[in-house]
């Protein structure tokens, strides 16, 4: 048995007997299901919408090479830079090289599962670069020294009392803050982090082949701030995130929001199409997109496993 698998089994046996942990998880799942049951009413025929999305993803994955090359062509025409990474180390080296070129000492980050996949944060920390998670749930996990618990709700297993104690212990926040007060307290800390950051790093919800752009959907606005204040924006994504057209977002964004959080649409939906142009007054001076393989082409070659690349990371399962 692999050492990591052995450790997982040992820790999971302990966790399943933790009744308080189970209570918090069951509560979170119940709230998610209630939100989904309300939110799905935005679709007149949800099952047909899901089938249509699956068909689009099937066609895209079947012609993945074509759409990725189209994205690269369009994105570079807009002044963006595309980096292909076969494995995590190549992606990490690319990020580090950019940081060195920009003499970066601080990085702000929005939620990204692919950066968890390549273990970006500890890598940058080992090279003397300060990395701050700006999604509230991710920030809580970072302060706790823990990985995200769930791809949509990273700290769903923590109670408000636990978070209040954590903020008091780690950030010297007043004891016993309510959730709204904790949010305001975090905002005050992170605002200065955005201003001071040299580089902003985001994940990607969808790559748009026809216009050569990156689509990011969020509820807190932190991804926009990560890309607005720093002079350099790095977006890191798996190669399977591609969609043929910007028009597909009319289907995929509501599907993602409904299944992820029960919303009709998330609060902030942004399309990034490259670095700031000469006549534009905001945005990064440089934008990079790192396209990560890390075994995805092996999955693509496996007919039985290929369907897993249709996943849009809504977290509903």
Residue ranges of model-derived segments:
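Cysteine-centered iron-sulfur cluster-binding motifs in ferredoxin-type domains/subunits
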Residues: 305-317
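The feature marks the mature, well-folded catalytic cores of soluble enzymes
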Residues: 1-306
């Amino acid at each position: 048995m692999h050492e990591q698998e052995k450790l997982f089994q040992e820790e999971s046996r302990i966790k399943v007997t933790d009744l308080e942990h189970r209570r918090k998880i069951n509560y979170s799942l119940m709230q998610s299901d209630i939100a989904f049951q309300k939110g799905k009413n935005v679709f007149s025929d949800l099952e047909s919408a899901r089938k249509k999305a699956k068909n689009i993803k099937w066609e895209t994955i079947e012609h993945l090479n074509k759409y990725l090359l189209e994205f690269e062509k369009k994105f570079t025409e807009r002044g963006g830079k595309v980096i292909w990474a076969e494995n995590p180390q190549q992606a990490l080296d690319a990020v580090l090289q950019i940081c060195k070129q920009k003499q970066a000492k601080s990085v702000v980050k929005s939620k990204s599962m692919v950066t968890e996949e390549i273990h970006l944060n500890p890598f940058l920390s080992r090279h003397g670069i300060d990395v701050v998670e700006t999604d509230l749930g991710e920030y809580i996990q970072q302060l706790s020294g823990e990985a995200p618990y769930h791809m949509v709700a990273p700290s769903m297993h923590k109670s408000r009392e636990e978070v209040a104690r954590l903020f008091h212990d780690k950030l010297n926040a007043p004891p016993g803050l309510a959730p709204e007060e904790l949010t305001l307290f975090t905002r005050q800390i992170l605002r200065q982090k955005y201003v001071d950051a040299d580089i902003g790093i985001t994940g990607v919800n969808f790559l748009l082949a026809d216009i050569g752009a990156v689509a990011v959907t969020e509820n807190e606005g932190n991804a926009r701030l990560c890309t607005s204040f720093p002079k350099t924006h790095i977006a890191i994504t798996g190669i399977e995130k591609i969609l043929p057209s910007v028009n597909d977002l009319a289907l995929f964004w509501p599907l993602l929001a409904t299944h992820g959080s029960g919303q009709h649409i998330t609060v902030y939906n942004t399309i990034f199409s490259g670095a700031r142009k000469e006549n534009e007054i905001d945005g990064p001076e440089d934008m990079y997109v790192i396209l990560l393989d890390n075994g995805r082409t092996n999955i693509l070659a496996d007919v039985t496993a290929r369907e897993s690349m249709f996943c849009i990371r809504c977290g509903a399962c």
